[in-house]
């Protein structure tokens, strides 16, 4: 099985944190991001998911720290948070990151994201964060606080623009340890030829194994955050279970 697990390092003001449903102000700190990243590498991670939450919330940047983390690791890193134009994208890629995830700008700048996808191919993934509002899945931007349009319309557009990978988060699940939204992930995967990365809600090894069962449907990886930091299971255990 080639299902990939990406331990997450979310950073606020230079510290590794986790949020509850992505809300600013709900941070719980877990110390040094570099120490966390090295720990996940040691436990066998082949990829790391690194999020600059200050950049995502438009209130600063942890770019130097991101570059330091990438430099100190021998594994693949995907960076996300605040990538909204050519300058921030080039800066992120210059760290040596293997992949850069773009969220808000993919919703708000359709012409720019089409150009970027054409230029950089699978070095770019698109973050699709959603909330169910009155029975309809709506995409979320700007640190998950603004509406970015109907999920299925956004997916159709980005699919036609050449996106090869979507990172899909049900915001109501993120940081809650309440289990992933399998139905949503499968529906998204069925609607696109792109690969889907599951994000949000994983709390048990059973959650990981259930997601991995849908690898042949296009869900080929999962991001794990709070479950690892809270010691629900170790990355080593999760990788061994796969």
Curated annotation (Swiss-Prot):
Catalytic activity: 1-(5-phospho-beta-D-ribosyl)-5-[(5-phospho-beta-D-ribosylamino)methylideneamino]imidazole-4-carboxamide = 5-[(5-phospho-1-deoxy-D-ribulos-1-ylimino)methylamino]-1-(5-phospho-beta-D-ribosyl)imidazole-4-carboxamide
Biological-process GO terms, alphabetical: L-histidine biosynthetic process; L-tryptophan biosynthetic process
Compartment(s) of residence: Cytoplasm
The protein's annotated pathway: Amino-acid biosynthesis; L-histidine biosynthesis; L-histidine from 5-phospho-alpha-D-ribose 1-diphosphate: step 4/9
Keyword Cytoplasm applies: yes
GO CC annotations on file: cytoplasm
Record-annotated disulphide pairs: none
List of catalytic residues: 10 (proton acceptor)
Keywords for the protein's UniProt record, in alphabetical order: Amino-acid biosynthesis, Cytoplasm, Histidine biosynthesis, Isomerase
HAMAP family with a match to the protein in the record: HisA
Matching PANTHER family: 1-(5-PHOSPHORIBOSYL)-5-[(5-PHOSPHORIBOSYLAMINO)METHYLIDENEAMINO] IMIDAZOLE-4-CARBOXAMIDE ISOMERASE (PTHR43090:SF2)
Family: Belongs to the HisA/HisF family.
Protein name as it appears in the record: 1-(5-phosphoribosyl)-5-[(5-phosphoribosylamino)methylideneamino] imidazole-4-carboxamide isomerase
Organism expressing this protein natively: Corynebacterium diphtheriae (strain ATCC 700971 / NCTC 13129 / Biotype gravis)
Originating gene: hisA
